[in-house]
């Protein structure tokens, strides 16, 4: 997959009999999902229009040339991407795209490397950062809050972590 692509959502299922699909969006607002133009899965491009917004991150959409439930079922679990340069420029230092965080070094407040960011999840209530620990093959997941991650430096490729006492500092062992 190209490095300049940002995942905006994933098709989770078909919806109805006329080829509509249910899409889990990763945009700040679900209405923004189609604002940036045609989307791609890395091979094909799709012209998508929103039929309805179901929840904070679920939409029902129509994809051009998908006309039946069978057609829509073939797209299940397909990730949809946009070229990063089609997204708006971020002007606030506290704003960034999730994709920019993947691979950042996670640094403890004592300047020791704790690990690096493997993935960002959202199971409903908030974003969760998955960190590959530097001293093992294990990983840990922590809520992505300003209290736990007080400082992010995208240009220098690191993020500071303030570990909750219940987690402890496993990199000291």
Curated annotation (Swiss-Prot):
The record, for InterPro entries, names: PRC_barrel-like_sf, PRC_RimM, RimM, RimM_N, RimM_N_sf, Transl_B-barrel_sf
GO BP terms in the entry: ribosomal small subunit biogenesis; rRNA processing
> Where does the UniProt annotation locate this protein?
Cytoplasm
Give start and end of each PRC barrel domain: 93-167
Cystines in this chain: none
Which Pfam families does the annotation name?
A: PRC_RimM (PF24986), RimM (PF01782)
Protein origin, superkingdom = Bacteria
Which GO molecular function entries does the Swiss-Prot or TrEMBL record give? Answer: ribosome binding
Q: How does it assemble?
A: Binds ribosomal protein uS19.
Q: Which NCBIfam families match?
A: 16S_RimM (TIGR02273), PRK14592.1 (NF011186)
Give the similarity note: Belongs to the RimM family.
Q: State the name under which the record lists this protein.
A: Ribosome maturation factor RimM
């Amino acid at each position: 997959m190209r490095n300049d692509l940002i995942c905006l959502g994933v098709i989770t299922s078909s919806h109805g009999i006329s080829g509509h699909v249910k899409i889990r969006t990763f945009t700040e607002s679900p209405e923004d999902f189609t604002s940036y133009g045609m989307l791609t899965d890395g091979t094909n491009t799709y012209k998508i229009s929103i039929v309805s917004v179901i929840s904070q991150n679920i939409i029902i959409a129509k994809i051009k040339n998908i006309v039946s439930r069978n057609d829509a079922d073939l797209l299940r679990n397909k990730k949809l991407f946009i070229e990063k340069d089609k997204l708006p420029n971020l002007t606030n230092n506290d704003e960034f795209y999730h994709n920019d965080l993947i691979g950042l070094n996670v640094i403890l407040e004592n300047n020791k490397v704790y690990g690096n960011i493997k993935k960002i999840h959202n199971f409903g209530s908030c974003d969760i950062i998955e960190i590959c620990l530097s001293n093992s093959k294990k990983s840990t997941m922590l809520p992505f809050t300003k209290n736990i991650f007080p400082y992010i430096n995208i240009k220098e490729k690191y993020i500071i972590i303030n570990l909750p006492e219940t987690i402890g500092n496993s990199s000291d062992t």
